[in-house]
Amino acid sequence: MATATIALGTDSIKMENGQGTAAKLGLPPLTPEQQEALQKAKKYAMEQSIKSVLVKQTIAHQQQQLTNLQMAAVTMGFGDPLSPLQSMAAQRQRALAIMCRVYVGSIYYELGEDTIRQAFAPFGPIKSIDMSWDSVTMKHKGFAFVEYEVPEAAQLALEQMNSVMLGGRNIKVGRPSNIGQAQPIIDQLAEEARAFNRIYVASVHQDLSDDDIKSVFEAFGKIKSCTLARDPTTGKHKGYGFIEYEKAQSSQDAVSSMNLFDLGGQYLRVGKAVTPPMPLLTPATPGGLPPAAAVAAAAATAKITAQEAVAGAAVLGTLATPGLVSPALTLAQPLGALPQAVMAAQAPGVITGVTPARPPIPVTIPSVGVVNPILASPPTLGLLEPKKEKEEEELFPESERPEMLSEQEHMSISGSSARHMVMQKLLRKQESTVMVLRNMVDPKDIDDDLEGEVTEECGKFGAVNRVIIYQEKQGEEEDAEIIVKIFVEFSVASETHKAIQDLNGRWFAGRKVVAEVYDQERFDNSDLSA
């Protein structure tokens, strides 16, 4: 073995085959920050690789379709061009594809694709967003193309998002420049759509059903059909659908009254249908890609998800999960690190929550449509006569007979009553299981036995999950008053209401106890200040 010795003062370092001690001992271990940066780099490279492959496959697929169409025009019928019917079908498909796209310009350079997606998502499901990037500055060029699943979503976005303030700039929203060649077909589709009294409804709450939407909208007239588009995989609706009325006036009233109406915490987007009725189909593969590309994308996504899970478990408690994380996880990151989620439809006329990396940028949207709906026809409430059991007739007079749940489920409601019932349905899903007891004890009365005593007493009304005794100082002064609030969480809401009914107003140690329902969301977020 060849060796060499380098003398440095009194010390010497022996080299073997040109390798020093550092090579023999190995590199020092990576710090947590370096490990995080490495994981980010790996995941970013994987994401870019997948995006590049999908773009190439999409382009190849589109070119293949164009080639097939051209070949069909030459070969079909021994050299004859496509038949008029086939040619018209192809033209309509191209026109529909163009109608689904909108151009978005004057985008602030700090805003990314996620911000654009979340700002435009309330109008309908987005198939793709195409942003052009400058390879030198590594920033987008200030414009993008948003492609929706249905033309009506693009039409609503065009009507309601043009000149909206986004990131400190008034964005420009319009049709793509190539719409001119398809304009005659688009006009023809619009003319056909006028023969049907259809409206498009988007931003529908996930917990609402077709019947719920129908009951709300039938206040404006008789409905022929009401269908929400379904995801064939999950079976859940995708947040949009179409309603067809018998009369044109009904559809006009519904659009003018229900656009931007708050239904279940989400503001509906309602507009006239711009295409004739077609089946609410979902492409079998995302974005119309060939099956191989869809499978590859799904596999790659699963791989990335697995990497995130492994990386998150390795650095739990010390590091935030790198890369694409859920909005809840981004709360752990420093302010300004990533854009926050955009709730584009939190209030009529306002888009809130858009926070680019720097600086903080307000996002506002001018008021559109009617915020407080004016009913075109007075709401009606008709109850179907329930079947009465013999025992009920004997026990209760007709005026005092209780309504059974099965009877309530068959009520026929419409108009404002329908909207109220739908809102109540959504609120029931969030009923609180937490009771707060006020004015029960003084701070000096708190001891180790108090929690057990409260648990035992409240256990008479149901299963108690936990008891929290909270002392709240009423000011910054040293001698500020301290009040005691006792929070009791039951297993179900009915037990909470039973306890409140029994304990509210009861006297305890010379004090009149106040028992109330406490907001579940506040309690879950450890906010005991209300």
Curated annotation (Swiss-Prot):
It is found in: Nucleus. The modification N6-acetyllysine is found at residues 222, 425. One of its GO terms (molecular function) is RNA binding. Residues 398-408 have a biased composition (Basic and acidic residues). One of its GO terms (biological process) is alternative mRNA splicing, via spliceosome. Residues 1-487 are annotated as: Inhibits homodimerization. GO terms for cellular component: nucleus; ribonucleoprotein complex. The modification Phosphoserine is found at residues 83, 215. The modification Phosphothreonine is found at residues 31, 285. Keywords: Acetylation, Apoptosis, DNA-binding, Isopeptide bond, mRNA processing, mRNA splicing, Nucleus, Phosphoprotein, Repeat, Repressor, Ribonucleoprotein, RNA-binding, Transcription, Transcription regulation, Ubl conjugation. Pfam families: RRM_1 (PF00076). Residues 100-178, 197-275, 433-520 form the RRM domain. Residues 48-530 are annotated as: Inhibits transcriptional repression, interaction with ERCC3 and apoptosis induction. The third RNA recognition motif, called PUMP domain, is atypical and may rather mediate homodimerization and/or protein-protein interactions. DNA- and RNA-binding protein, involved in several nuclear processes such as pre-mRNA splicing, apoptosis and transcription regulation. In association with FUBP1 regulates MYC transcription at the P2 promoter through the core-TFIIH basal transcription factor. Acts as a transcriptional repressor through the core-TFIIH basal transcription factor. Represses FUBP1-induced transcriptional activation but not basal transcription. Decreases ERCC3 helicase activity. Is also involved in pre-mRNA splicing. This is Poly(U)-binding-splicing factor PUF60. It comes from Bos taurus (Bovine).
